[in-house]
Amino acid sequence: MAATTDLIAHGRLIFGIGVGGTRVRGDFRHWGGQNPAIREFEAYGVPLVAPVEGIAALAESCTIIRRMWTEASPFDFDGRFYQLKGAICEPKPRQRPHPPILIGGYGERTLRVITEHADIWNIPGPPFLSVEDFRRKRAVLDEHCAAMGRDPGEITRSVQIFLSGDDPAATRALAAELIDAGVQQVILALQPPVRPAQWVADEVIEPLRAAVPTG
């Protein structure tokens, strides 16, 4: 489906993937105090796995997806979580060698998977993670890249923040701070009630573009 979408979209697909949810323990005060994955997985009848299993399955998935997008001949895969016989993807995506793979996550083990497989690394910004949290996680990612012999500049750093319709200046200030910290892609998430989005361009994007140096 992703390969077909990339063809339909004339090579504009960004393929986002992640663990999706695990039985991780942590601070979920921004989600009402409960791990949101519990309700989501129960709704679809999908078992919620431990973090170590979810991350290992993610790594296998990335390996399989990349091979299906790039290999011309059918292949077998005998993994811990996935076993394939004669797997092949046709038609191939339009982008070569493949669409950019965006992986969301910021845990230690997840960052290792990101180092190995991702073209874009995405995390949530405030109020979930602070700008200083991003700096710390970025340093860990850079260390993993050095250990694996990968140029950290190959991985685009992406952060999602929530737009404030009541205070666009606050959104601009936060985005500018993130860019100064090394974020290359700021994703602006609208919150309900949603009004026509022209204000986002007029009050956030264009003033930010004029204020923040590029290049």
Predicted features along the sequence, with ranges:
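Active-site-adjacent structural elements that line small-molecule/cofactor binding pockets in enzymes
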Residues: 1-215
